[in-house]
Amino acid sequence: MTGFHFALEDYHGYNRFGNPAKALKAYVDCFSKEELTLDCQALVDIGYEMINHYVNEWLPRRNIYKTLIIDGVPQVEVESSIYIPELSEAFGIPVIYQLKYDRVVTDPDGRFWIQDHKTAASFNISKLETDPQVSAYCWAFPYIYGQTSAGMLYSQYKKAIVEEPRILKNGNISTDKTQNTTYERYLKALKERYGNITFPPKNKEVLDILLEQETPESDAFIRWDRVARNEHNNESEYLKILAEGYEMLNPKLAIYPNPTSDCSWSCNFYNVCLAQDDGSDWEFMINEDFEIRKHEEEIWRSKIQYPQ
């Protein structure tokens, strides 16, 4: 969800729109009605709800991280290129490792964290200890900022709408434990219905379940995980980067297709691949049916209308 990322970039950066929902609207306005399919519009609608929950409910109780600012420039969407001398010398060409940080923050103890925003249908934390992106970003940090980071603040946002607690026909609050709501919203609904007295046992049970989902850095819809990497991790990651580089730049590397059951529906080059195998003019197909993709981000960013 590029628009969601842009909204957070502006909000935690220069905050030119004053509200990330307005930033998302500015992003959407960069596209024509023809370009915004029904699926796109559905994601936009969810994006507004995700932003509302993040800004108005989740963040105010967890706003301990501050965007790093250097010479007046907020460190959001930080693009960097790191020269790799070993590979450059080995192949006789400049070899550059490129990456982009969503945001660099400091915690109350003054430590640096690389924040990475992820939108997904569900949370995934099982991969974090071995995630190569986490490791590579932490390895690169000293080359960019001259000091090590504490690690990555891996931030996940569910593509889901936080709903209000359901109200039954008799006016009572539903005790359905699968409601897509939060502890704060459910508690507010109970107080509005029953006042500050003791709540019905079944409602209290649901409230306790929702409370269990709340931590200093997470709820059922957003969670931030601190993923640490030390100096040894960084050294180990660099060796992997070198190994990958030697393989990628090897002029004698044999490159061949790796067909899977998904090819027929997920690969735009499916017919070209078949043509290459059966002797058809696959080069003609490439030249006639394909073009070099333009840098998508440059296109929409050039259309953003910032407030005057």
What is each PLM-predicted segment?
Residues 1-308:
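RecB-family 4Fe-4S metal-dependent nuclease core
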